[in-house]
Design a protein with these regions (language model features):
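Nucleotidyltransferase catalytic core that binds NTPs
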Residues: 1-156
Length: 156
């Protein structure tokens, strides 16, 4: 049986912490679809094509990973792809409480989709996409937050 999970996020950009969660999800599922969300109300630091390119660089050599973009409810994307598991990563208890609330709401909308919350490994707990963006704006150096081998594109 081929088990699939959706790993949704804005991934602006995809970090070493995201990769840690993805690799751990791949030990539980045959396929993990990284779903890059489009938020019409937010202007991303990196555009959609750049974010997808960063993820492609990060997952190079990993089997069972595909990348999509979506602009509807995450639950609707799960149904569109026949997925019954959604993976979410958390760094700390604040993240956990937020994700648990979202999972509860999603369960009401779609009881057939289960949210799997994976705590990031401790060495990645300090990493966030927001921190990467701050470092890029202020210092220009953020490689220590990124998956090995990822080269960030020029930003707008």
């Amino acid at each position: 049986m081929n088990t699939k999970a959706l790993f949704p996020g804005s991934f602006d950009p995809f970090t070493a912490g995201h990769l840690n969660i993805l690799k751990r999800a791949l030990t539980m599922f045959d396929e993990v679809i990284v779903a890059v969300g489009i938020n019409q109300d937010k202007r991303g630091f990196f555009d959609m094509d750049q974010r997808i390119d960063i993820i492609r660089q990060a997952v190079k050599g990993l089997n069972g990973v595909s990348i999509i973009k979506y602009d509807n409810l995450t639950i609707d994307t799960c149904h569109e792809y026949g997925i019954h598991h959604m993976v979410r990563g958390v760094r700390n208890m604040i993240d956990f409480e937020t994700e648990r609330s979202i999972a509860d709401a999603n369960r009401k909308l779609a009881p057939d989709v289960e949210t799997i919350i994976i705590p990031t490994a401790q060495e990645f707990a300090h990493i966030s996409s927001s921190a990467v963006r701050v470092f890029l704006k202020l210092h220009g150096e953020s490689s220590f937050f990124l998956p090995e081998g990822v080269i960030l594109p020029e930003t707008r």
